[in-house]
């Protein structure tokens, strides 16, 4: 383990193609795309971990080490992070608005993942740590006006996050901020807004709005139904991000100083 004093004064060397990159939630949509992104850039040591059995992973990248691990368990996080230079935590129990409204306890339990992963990354001597947060961390009062303005990072406070899922994200963000301030582990946080694209979930309740709308339109055409059901009245403004832009942004935010 690198000492706290050394962490605080040491300048990071450039990430080598042989440095170990660990991706929690690598069997999921964004995690799998991130593994492919780094593989395509020529990184030779990539380890991904996910609680889903391997046949259920969204995509598997040739040459990437794949571990079937439940990262809400501390020892599994230690195993996943061993030897890591950079750790990306995209593991979470989450889905679309229907899922996070119905299964708040499951969403809240994801705080265990970040608690154990960031500590395991720190103990393993990782230089940098990424956490995938969400727009649900923002104050819900900002979502009442259909003429919504672009949000700043500071708009999450005063805090009134989405119940369950949003609060889990906000407190996990605080973990990241304090690990950097107190222990010198460089952390980066991104609040995702409706990421979509190839290999994304499109049914089962965990899908986001773009995939859900596409599925409903196709089903309506197949069944001959003239209408589909959507949430809300169509007036709120929504933000969407394509998966390629998302993983590029993760890479950039982790490696900008």
Predicted regions and their residues:
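NAD(P)H-binding glycine-rich loop region in Rossmannoid oxidoreductase-like domains
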Residues: 64, 68-111, 120-123, 140
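Flexible, glycine-rich beta-alpha linker
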Residues: 137-139, 164, 188-210, 236-237
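Conserved glycine-rich Rossmann-like NAD(P)H-binding loop of the short-chain dehydrogenase/reductase
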Residues: 43-53
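Conserved Rossmann-fold NAD(P)-dependent oxidoreductase catalytic core, especially the SDR/UDP-sugar
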Residues: 89, 115-162, 188
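Active-site Tyr-X1-5-Lys
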Residues: 160-193, 212-223
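Short-chain dehydrogenase/reductase
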Residues: 107-111, 161-173, 203-211, 239-240
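N-terminal Rossmann NAD(P)H-binding glycine-rich loop of SDR-like oxidoreductase domains
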Residues: 20-41
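Alpha-helical substrate-binding/gating segment
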Residues: 181, 195-198, 210-228, 238-257
């Amino acid at each position: 383990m690198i000492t706290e004093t050394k962490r605080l004064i040491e300048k990071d060397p450039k990430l080598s193609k042989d440095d170990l990159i660990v991706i929690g939630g690598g069997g999921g949509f964004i995690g799998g795309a991130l593994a492919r992104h780094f593989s395509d850039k020529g990184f030779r040591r990539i380890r991904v971990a996910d609680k889903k059995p391997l046949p259920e992973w969204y995509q598997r990248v040739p040459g990437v080490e794949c571990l079937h691990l439940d990262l809400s368990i501390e020892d599994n996080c230690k195993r996943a992070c061993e030897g890591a230079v950079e750790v990306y935590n995209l593991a979470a129990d989450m889905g679309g608005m229907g899922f996070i409204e119905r299964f708040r306890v499951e969403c809240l339990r994801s705080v265990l993942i970040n608690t154990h992963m960031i500590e395991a990354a720190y103990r393993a001597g990782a230089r940098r740590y990424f956490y995938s947060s969400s727009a649900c961390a923002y104050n819900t009062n900002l979502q009442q006006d259909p003429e919504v303005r672009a949000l700043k990072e500071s708009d999450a406070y005063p805090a009134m996050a989405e119940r369950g899922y949003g609060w889990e994200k906000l407190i996990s963000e605080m973990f990241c901020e304090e690990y950097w301030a107190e222990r010198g582990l460089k952390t980066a946080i991104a609040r995702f807004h409706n990421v979509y694209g190839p290999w994304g979930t499109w049914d089962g309740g965990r899908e986001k709005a773009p995939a859900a709308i596409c599925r409903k339109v196709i089903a309506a055409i197949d069944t001959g139904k003239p209408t589909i059901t959507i949430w809300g009245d169509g007036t709120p403004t929504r933000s969407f991000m394509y998966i390629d832009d998302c993983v590029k942004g993760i890479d950039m935010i982790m490696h900008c100083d």
